Design a protein with these regions (language model features):
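Nudix hydrolase/Nudix homology domain
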Residues: 28, 34-35, 102-165
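Unchanged
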Residues: 42-67, 75-133
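Hydrophobic/anchoring residues in structured secondary elements
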Residues: 68-73, 162
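Generic short beta-strand segments
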Residues: 23-25, 71-77
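N-terminal strand-loop-strand
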Residues: 1-37, 65
Length: 165
């Protein structure tokens, strides 16, 4: 099945300058390597991207006491997941919180089957890790965001060639 959608994601940072990532795998494709991703999902009809980002963050992580920031990045990605082909135009917000534990709320069945866990990552640890991450260019663009140097306009971080994730 082909799904063309607009989506919202969140780079969630805590007071210790760590980023929160969800560990996921494709429940349909056992040969696809697990990855770490920023929380997010589809934008509902008439829904603002910041509202969608906050809703998705809560559903996927259980973290709800946040300060939502602006859209820092955009990306156009195409990928297969759970037997679906996604063509996704994404707005990626930054948000801050005091911390929190992974306690997902209201996951869709496919998400519940895909999510392995989640945790906070320190910048150095993320930059040194060879674990696959999404967005694919997260490591290249995260350092100034964690330092508080937000772009005046969203930066397009789309992969050069659209690739499966």
């Amino acid at each position: 099945m082909f799904l063309k959608r607009n989506a919202a994601r969140v780079v969630l940072l805590d007071k210790k300058e760590r980023i929160f990532l969800v560990n996921a795998e494709d429940p349909i494709d056992p040969f696809k390597e697990p990855w770490w991703e920023i929380p997010g999902g589809g934008i509902g009809r008439g829904e603002d991207s910041s509202v969608a980002a906050e809703r998705e963050l809560y559903e996927e992580t259980g973290i709800d006491s946040i300060k939502m920031g602006p859209v820092i990045w955009t990306q156009h990605v195409q990928f297969t997941f759970g037997g679906y082909f996604f063509d996704s135009y994404e707005k990626i917000h930054v948000a801050w919180c005091d911390g929190g534990e992974y306690r997902p709320q209201h996951l869709e069945a496919l998400e519940a089957a895909a999510f392995i866990g989640a945790r906070w990552w320190e910048l150095g640890e993320l930059l040194q890790s060879e674990e696959p991450v999404l967005p694919t260019l997260l490591r290249e663009h995260i350092t100034p965001i964690i330092a508080g140097d937000l772009p005046e306009e969203p930066i397009d971080i789309s992969p050069v060639q659209l690739e499966e994730s």
